[in-house]
């Protein structure tokens, strides 16, 4: 099961839990990028570039002017951009699938909460790096024509997802959920 399962196949508890795997896998793949940690510190005085050096593409970070969303093709940001959007679309698919699943309500609630947490987490990274972002919470295929929402609207969506997730996520310490989202 290397990708998101067909929505028709999300009928049992095992199907729903298995469908979480590609969402977490994409997040793991995104975090393997060595630049992710650095992009979160650029724009501060922690890391700067030297004008005479070979890091010209990184100068946008010194001026903190990369948040206009126009630099998503910058090599240092492209991996994060693509990876977090994949997490969002996988999470959207799972949230849609949970709605029609015949699995027990308790597991549906947990899986929905995890998917919403992962979507919120991804938006949190994207809005900090790119500013105004499209909010795509319906559908699983981007059109490329989604309008950008303001940073405030993005944070409201993040908060909404996190509040819904908080109700559904399990308490920390469950051995069945090691490495997965929980309430802490």
Residue spans for each PLM region:
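Amphipathic alpha-helical protein-interaction segments enriched in hydrophobic
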Residues: 178-184
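Short linear capping/connector segments at secondary-structure termini
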Residues: 2-5, 137-143
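Conserved, well-structured interaction surfaces
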Residues: 17, 25-31, 55-130, 144-153, ...
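Acidic, glycine-rich segments characteristic of secretory precursors and extracytoplasmic regions
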Residues: 1-44, 48-52, 152
